[in-house]
């Protein structure tokens, strides 16, 4: 049983070491009880078998991962579209390099798991401790917990994992991914979202988010993330859903054009920047919302309107906002009559000489 026996007896081994003698009573921790339960349920299946390093699975895949002090990244060599990236929080960024490298394996493996099912996976890392811990476990609880997560993912998805160390100069691609910083790592305040969801929902999918800031169970992400339904929202058809859209500012025009292409509906959050490049796409005359906007509201202006993600110095959320933010109800299926201007004026008083 190789690595399985070593990894799944670490906490029990600690319990044995704590005994004064073989006849003394010991305290069984929750982790050690979980290991006992695991062996009770699986010893008859695993006994006499080499599970972790099995070579009988026909599909063989190579994965590479790395972690920097700001983020982590990974990719599947034969499937370049399977690329994972996630920022570190401040607390995560100060953890040991081994913890970050091991966490990167956990997160990436979880993100890729459904695509790697029933495969023999060779996982390459430039941290030698990762190879050792995933073979033998660790005496450090935080590292052992991560090793167990990796093992459980493999068990659930029938993945045979073999971890190998490679020199840093052979892991350049994963290293580059891990050094990306997503400055659009923010989301809308949960209470404000719930209000909009009650007003125009229920929304069915969050098109621009990640595993730790998604507002809905279904979400799209820029990179593969644990739980994401699809990567690249613009490669998806939006016409069947009530879309929740809080995109990076640089993508607002593309969002509107894609909604038009799909004849989609949804709620779009954007800053009220009348000098911005996207403004004429939203308000052709510079004042009144275009006919695809069927309703709209100002969002309350307070410091917590946008919630920062894990990245430091994100565009919104890391400092107080001094501008208005609006939520537009967009409907390309049933736009309002273009001549209907009353109530759709973006002037401070809510009206101008054309619509008063």
What label would you give each PLM region?
Residues 1-54:
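C-terminal reverse transcriptase regions that engage the nucleic-acid substrate
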Residues 8, 12, 64-66, 74, ...:
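Mobile genetic element proteins and their domesticated derivatives, centered on retroelements
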Residues 48-58, 114, 229-238, 257:
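A short acidic-Thr-Gly-centered motif at the start of a beta-strand
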Residues 56-70, 105, 206-210:
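Two-metal-ion RNase H-like nuclease active-site motif
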Residues 78-103, 111, 128-145:
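A short, polar/acidic, helix/strand-boundary loop motif
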Residues 109-173:
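RNase H catalytic domain
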């Amino acid at each position: 049983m190789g690595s399985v026996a070593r990894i799944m007896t670490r906490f029990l081994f600690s319990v044995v070491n704590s005994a004064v003698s073989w006849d003394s009573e010991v305290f069984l921790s929750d982790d050690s009880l979980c290991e006992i339960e695991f062996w009770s349920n699986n010893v008859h299946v695993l006994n006499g078998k080499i599970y972790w390093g099995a070579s009988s699975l026909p599909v063989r895949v190579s994965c590479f991962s790395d972690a920097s002090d700001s983020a982590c990244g990974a990719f599947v060599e034969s499937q370049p579209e399977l690329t994972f990236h996630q920022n570190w929080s401040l607390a995560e960024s100060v953890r040991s390099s081994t913890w970050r490298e091991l966490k990167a394996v956990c997160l990436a493996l979880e993100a890729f798991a459904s695509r790697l099912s029933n495969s023999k996976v060779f996982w390459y890392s430039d941290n030698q401790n990762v190879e050792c811990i995933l073979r033998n476990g660790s005496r450090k609880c935080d590292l052992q917990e991560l090793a167990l997560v990796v093992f459980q993912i493999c068990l659930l998805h029938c993945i045979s994992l073999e971890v190998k160390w490679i020199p840093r100069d052979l892991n350049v691609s994963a290293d580059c991914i891990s050094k990306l910083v997503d400055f659009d790592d923010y989301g809308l305040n949960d209470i404000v979202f719930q209000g909009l969801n009650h007003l125009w929902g229920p929304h069915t999918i969050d098109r621009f988010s990640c595993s730790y800031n998604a507002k809905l169970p279904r979400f799209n992400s820029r990179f593969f993330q644990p739980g994401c339904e699809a990567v690249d929202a613009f490669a998806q058809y939006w016409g069947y859903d009530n879309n929740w859209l809080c995109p990076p500012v640089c993508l607002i025009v593309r969002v509107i054009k894609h909604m038009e292409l799909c004849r989609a509906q949804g709620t779009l959050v954007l800053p009220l920047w009348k000098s911005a490049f996207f403004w004429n796409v939203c308000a052709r005359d510079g004042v009144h919302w275009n006919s695809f906007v069927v309703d709209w509201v100002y969002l309350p202006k307070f410091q917590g309107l946008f919630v920062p993600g894990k990245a430091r110095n994100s565009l919104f959320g890391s400092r107080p906002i001094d501008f208005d933010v609006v939520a537009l109800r967009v409907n390309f299926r049933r736009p309002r009559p273009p001549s209907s201007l009353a109530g759709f004026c973006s002037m401070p008083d809510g009206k101008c000489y054309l619509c008063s």
